[in-house]
């Protein structure tokens, strides 16, 4: 495809939908990934590795045809009522295995904002690489509670084993990259998105996740409002004892 673009004089703009997965997920990753960050562990194979290779190909096109504006959008993990994603599959069952001692920070992107970012990039013709993600984060523990699921903390090896068992009961198995993201999370800096590309998502991470829960009609195992009420009472008791 890029070879055909290179030979076509009429091509003036190429937009590549890439992914935040090129940064990987690792416990020693930076708190926030910028466009200049790289994975702490080499990406050996799979979708993240393929995405990074494709980014290299399109940059090569830009070097050979400097008259073409090449824009790379690294989208945060998307979510929404119509999306089948690692997170939606992870929350499919009533019990959600989590890595003992870890609470991943998740930055999401609503499916409608993903389309909005692609539209903005197409109209703006701004070359460069841009992180595309919503404001704010949601902790994995929050996501489990807000979807009415029950967390099942297990050692890291146990998550993969339990997920394989879930596959046998018709829930999709998660690959290694997805399990690492669900264990450690990933957050991107989106300054360039706002200041250079001129795009601002309409949905925050929390709003995007709540829209997914509403749209999927998830039946809570435990009423999320009851859990939040218990948390508020526990905080109030702790504050009284501490005063």
Outline where the language-model segments fall.
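Conserved loop-to-helix N-cap of the C-terminal "lid" that shapes the substrate pocket in Rossmann-like
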Residues: 72, 102-115, 129, 140, ...
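Mid/C-terminal beta-alpha module of Rossmann-like enzyme folds, strongest
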Residues: 115-177, 190, 209-210, 219-233, ...
């Amino acid at each position: 495809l890029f070879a055909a673009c290179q030979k076509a004089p009429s091509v003036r703009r190429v937009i590549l939908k890439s992914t935040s997965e090129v940064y990987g997920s690792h416990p020693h990753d930076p708190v926030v990934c910028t466009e200049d960050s790289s994975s702490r562990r080499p990406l050996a194979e799979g979708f993240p590795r393929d995405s990074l290779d494709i980014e290299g190909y399109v940059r090569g096109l830009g070097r050979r045809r400097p008259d073409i504006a090449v824009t790379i959008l690294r989208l945060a993990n998307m979510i929404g009522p119509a999306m089948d994603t690692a997170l939606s599959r992870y929350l499919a069952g009533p019990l959600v295995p989590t890595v003992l001692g870890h609470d991943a920070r998740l930055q999401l992107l609503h499916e409608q904002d993903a389309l909005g970012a692609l539209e903005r990039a197409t109209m703006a013709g701004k070359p460069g690489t841009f992180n595309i993600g919503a404001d704010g984060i949601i902790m994995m523990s929050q996501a489990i509670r807000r979807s009415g699921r029950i967390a099942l903390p297990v050692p890291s090896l146990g998550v993969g084993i339990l997920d394989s068992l879930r596959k046998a009961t018709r829930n999709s198995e998660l690959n290694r990259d997805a399990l690492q993201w669900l264990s450690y999370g990933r957050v991107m800096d989106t300054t360039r998105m706002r200041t250079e590309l001129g795009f601002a998502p309409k949905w925050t991470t929390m709003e995007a996740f709540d829209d997914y829960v509403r749209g999927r009609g998830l039946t809570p195992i435990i009423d999320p409002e009851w859990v939040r009420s218990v948390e508020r009472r526990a905080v109030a008791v702790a504050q009284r004892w501490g005063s």
